[in-house]
Amino acid sequence: MENLKKRFDVLQDLLMNIYEQGSDTLESQIEHWQALRREAVLLYYARQNGVLRLGYLPVPPLATSEAKAKQAISMVLQLQSLQQSPYGTEKWTLVDTSIETFKNTPENHFKKGPINVEVIYDGDPDNANLYTMWKYVYYMDDNDQWQKTESGANHTGIYYLIGEFKHYYVLFADDANRYSKSGQWEVRINKETVFAPVTSSTPPDSPGGSRELPGSTANSKASSPTQQPQQACSDETTKRKRYGRRESSPTDSRCRRRSSSRQKKQGRRARSRTRSRCSSTQTRSRSTSRRSRSTSRGNRRCRGDTPRGQRGVSTSSRGRGRGSRRSSSSSSPTPRTKASQRGCDTRSVRDSGISPGDVGRKLQTVSGRNSGRLGRLLEEALDPPVILLRGGANTLKCFRNRAKLRYRGHYKAFSTSWSWVAADGTERLGRSRLLVSFTSFKQRSGFLDLVRFPKGVDWSLGSFDKL
């Protein structure tokens, strides 16, 4: 007991000397965190042996000491890594290397030079928020090398530069939805207005902004009525979330359920108009009735993009049954789009059917065992399946390194992390992406059953013509 108390007093004297000296070298900051680590380990050992007080200091619970020890170990590793970089010789104070600064937005980055950014909503000085913009931000790139960059602010938010890309770590529109009534705000830096009042509509080139692909305007005019509920649903999702989701993402299930009833009603009207334009022969009547049943099932999960002028083709691009094959063969030949062959992975290929022109797009040779000649042709027509992961760059990179060893044999390949870039600029949009490819849909299903994705990482399904 006395020996334990003496060691604890020595650590307290060491910490007091560090605080009194106020050194601004990185070596002294590493020494400070090493002392905090030893202090947490000593308190953990004391509590584990039933000691409840060391001098006048109560011994904290085991969980508290363990958390502080792990926190100190993490900071020591980060500072030692920074010490090996060209920025290790700069001035580093206790505030610059504190856990509060390191965990502040942007998280897990070293930062220097805090600057106050005031955002005033609706022109009311009493209705304002204060944000911290850091003059310099130190981050680790994909090659595990420390980089130093500058931070800035505009009408969209506060960002730091990664090369020529702007990575936003504060978006003013997020708080404007809660605090602003008119959707307007102005930005002040050091009590000087740098941006006049703007509305809360997110600019197209900012993260979370809606962006149309070329030809999307023309396609929206010619789309069937079944698309209108999903377009309104996607607009609502863009306003509510920072990053857009694909329809295959699990986060959009609630949005699809809300519009399913409207899709059914409008789908019936669209099919009735399609049948009125089709030939009145008995064969096409039977195919239309069968197609309507398969379409009603397909519309629950897949979205249709059928042009109005296309005769005898199902309004759902993925709800294909035997009737849809018969009707498409009786009409004029129409090439199928690539999007109509993706998404509904859980449906059987034998039930849905694939046209002969699509056979041969799969990269891997399919075994004909227990499937027959027809089943092998249908399987060969499928595109290679993939999983798209979205999350932080470091999180995705760590997950890839662990999964490559832990789940070997349950996937084909991993990609490096990448990001979307704005069409009219060089800004990165949203979070980082990572692709996982598979040799078959069965392998992908087994991978999803086996793997547990990290917190904050979402995924969606897809496929490509070639990898």
Swiss-Prot record:
Give the free-text PTM comment from the record.
Answer: Phosphorylated.
Q: Sorted alphabetically, which SUPFAM superfamilies does this protein's record hold?
A: E2 regulatory, transactivation domain, Viral DNA-binding domain
Transcription recorded as keyword: yes
Enumerate the InterPro entries for this protein. E2/EBNA1_C_sf (IPR035975), Nucleotide-bd_a/b_plait_sf (IPR012677), Papillomavirus_E2_C (IPR000427), PPV_E2_N (IPR001866), Reg_prot_E2 (IPR033668), Regulatory_protein_E2_N (IPR036050), Regulatory_protein_E2_N_1 (IPR042503), Regulatory_protein_E2_N_2 (IPR042504)
Superkingdom to which the source organism belongs: Viruses
Q: Where is the segment annotated Transactivation domain?
A: 1-201
Q: Which UniProt keyword terms apply here? A: Activator, DNA replication, DNA-binding, Early protein, Host nucleus, Phosphoprotein, Repressor, Transcription, Transcription regulation
Q: Which GO terms describe its biological process?
A: DNA replication; DNA-templated transcription; regulation of DNA replication; viral DNA genome replication
Biased composition of type Basic residues is found at: 255-276, 287-301
- GO MF annotation: an example: DNA-binding transcription factor activity
Please tell me one Gene Ontology term that the record gives under cellular component: host cell nucleus
Q: Which Pfam families match?
A: PPV_E2_C, PPV_E2_N
Family (UniProt): Belongs to the papillomaviridae E2 protein family.
Assembly, per entry? Binds DNA as homodimer. Interacts with protein E1; this interaction greatly increases E1 DNA-binding activity. Interacts with protein L1; this interaction enhances E2-dependent replication and transcription activation. Interacts with protein L2; this interaction inhibits E2 transcriptional activity but not DNA replication function E2. Interacts with protein E7; this interaction inhibits E7 oncogenic activity. Interacts with host TAF1; this interaction modulates E2-dependent transcriptional regulation. Interacts with host BRD4; this interaction mediates E2 transcriptional activation function.
Stated role: Plays a role in the initiation of viral DNA replication. A dimer of E2 interacts with a dimer of E1 in order to improve specificity of E1 DNA binding activity. Once the complex recognizes and binds DNA at specific sites, the E2 dimer is removed from DNA. E2 also regulates viral transcription through binding to the E2RE response element (5'-ACCNNNNNNGGT-3') present in multiple copies in the regulatory regions of the viral genome. Activates or represses transcription depending on E2RE's position with regards to proximal promoter elements including the TATA-box.
This protein is called: Regulatory protein E2
Q: Source taxonomy lineage?
A: Viruses, Monodnaviria, Shotokuvirae, Cossaviricota, Papovaviricetes
**UniProt gene name:** E2
